[in-house]
Regions:
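Short N-terminal helix/helix-N-cap motif within the alpha/beta-hydrolase-1
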Residues: 78-82
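A short glycine-rich, Lys/Arg-flanked "PGG" loop and its adjoining helix->strand segment in the class I
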Residues: 83-95
Length: 169
């Protein structure tokens, strides 16, 4: 679903890339960053960085990105870091560039806790979700540099897709 929201001829910033799957699916070049990056074979035009966005992202002096994705990432970012996170993205995206974000509905955390309590699932990092509210994204990405292009719920309403476009300054 997120792939459909990306512009063609994309220079992509994949925040939370894990193994670079999105680069393989789209054929895009760019940078993938993830603190839990796994070893992946080199991909032409793609730089993989083990670390956190934005602090560990290498300088990008030559070219802006025309798309960024953060799929199931923002709910793991501490609330006091989100404004800087959005501001950093604005400085890296070209005018008209898109940021595609997916976040779970708060109901998902409750469901995960019940399933973990019943020992039906394990290894879920629900405690890292910081009580994130999807509706907060509209205020985090408020301001003259962003325009909400799309918001929809998917997977029976358990997840949200947001697409913000970078406006010209």
């Amino acid at each position: 679903m997120a792939v459909r929201e990306l512009p063609k001829a994309t220079r992509l910033l994949d925040i939370g890339t894990h193994d670079g799957t999105l680069f393989r699916l789209t054929g895009a070049g760019g940078v993938g960053i993830d603190p839990e990056l796994v070893d992946v074979p080199p991909m032409a035009g793609v730089t993989m960085v083990k670390g956190f966005f934005p602090g560990d992202l290498p300088a990008q002096p030559d070219e802006l990105f025309n798309a960024a994705v953060a799929l199931a990432v923002l709910e793991h970012i501490p609330e006091d870091e989100l404004a800087n996170w959005a501001k950093s993205l604005a400085g890296l995206l070209s005018a008209g560039g898109r940021v595609v974000i997916t976040v779970p509905a708060p109901t998902v955390d409750h469901m995960l806790h019940v399933l973990m309590g019943l020992h039906l699932i394990a290894g879920i990092e629900a405690h890292q979700h910081h009580g994130f509210q999807p509706a907060d994204l509209e205020s985090i990405f408020a301001g003259p540099q962003w325009r909400l292009a799309r918001h929809r719920r998917f997977q029976l309403g358990l997840n949200h897709l947001y697409v913000f476009e970078r406006t010209s300054d």
